Amino acid sequence: LFIGSGGIRNTGDVAKAFALGADVVGITGIALHLIQESGVEAVVRYFEELSKQLTNYMLLLGATAPSDLRKVPVIYSCETTNYIANRGYDLVALSSNRR
């Protein structure tokens, strides 16, 4: 089980986590902040909107389930590519080994 968590703030982050192989995605920081500031109803609204937006992302990318996002080609920025390469990892191997 691969859990995508930490720094997940919006639908784009959720989609990226699934595309990189996450089985589930944790979004606790924003939920706790919303509960503290606006109550449980705000959290429910946030997750309802996030779910709608994720469905739109999946529609645009031809995915019928979040796990299908693993099949979508991932394009890394120059900064990310350099970060990975400078740590001795093979980006091609990492990209082809996505679940």
Where do the PLM segments sit?
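Alpha/beta catalytic cores of nucleotide-metabolism and tRNA/nucleoside-modifying enzymes
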Residues: 9-99
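Short beta-strand/loop segments at the ligand-binding rim of alpha/beta enzyme cores
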Residues: 1-5
